[in-house]
Amino acid sequence: MSSYMEAAAAARAAEAKTEGLLRGACALLAAAAALLVGLNTQTETVLFIRKKATVKDVQALWVLAMAAAAAAGYHLLQLLRCFYLSRFADGKPCRHRRAIAWLCFLLDKGCAYITFATTVAAAQACVVALYGTHALQWTKLCNIYTRFCEQVAGSLVCAMLAAVGTALLSVVSARNLFRLYPSMLSPPPSSFVG
């Protein structure tokens, strides 16, 4: 029986390390996206007028920078929780285990949805900046502010990878949550005589 307990403890430690690595990767990707888009500026001269492109010129990019920074902070806090559980918890039972699992599950889902939604909204705004909209007489901007648009594209890639990683983390937190509930299936009858 003790070998089973040791194997279960080793499996929990491996799961915590894997979750920690995934959370660390998501935190780095979200922080990279926030920094790439948030600190991005470019100044160009157009018809003898100096114009500066910043993240605040496009509301969707500003929202992406704030959401990515918040997601990076959230993943960092969850990474600290994973570190604590893998180092100090040692399988001790917790009275509030289900409540904490529900909270992590809901926060992971919310983070995944917000990260994905803000990334897609920023990508839509970037498509307008890339191609323009002739019906509204909006001109292309990426042929003027090339470096700015390239950095925004890099931040969109990082943010989308962070959103996919966050979706995977929400699957992990769902597994951790529903593992705390007993199975509703009845055990198979043990009438087999052998």
From Swiss-Prot:
Cytoplasmic side of membrane:
1-18, 81-109, 173-194
Sections of the chain in a coiled coil: none
Extracellular face residues: 40-59, 131-151
In terms of one coarse class, where is the protein primarily found? membrane
Which cell locations does it reside in? Cell membrane
Q: Transmembrane region positions?
A: 19-39, 60-80, 110-130, 152-172
Query: What interactions and quaternary structure are annotated?
Result: Homodimer and heterodimers.
Q: What is the name listed in the Swiss-Prot or TrEMBL entry for this protein?
A: CASP-like protein 2C1
Q: What organism does this protein naturally occur in?
A: Oryza sativa subsp. japonica
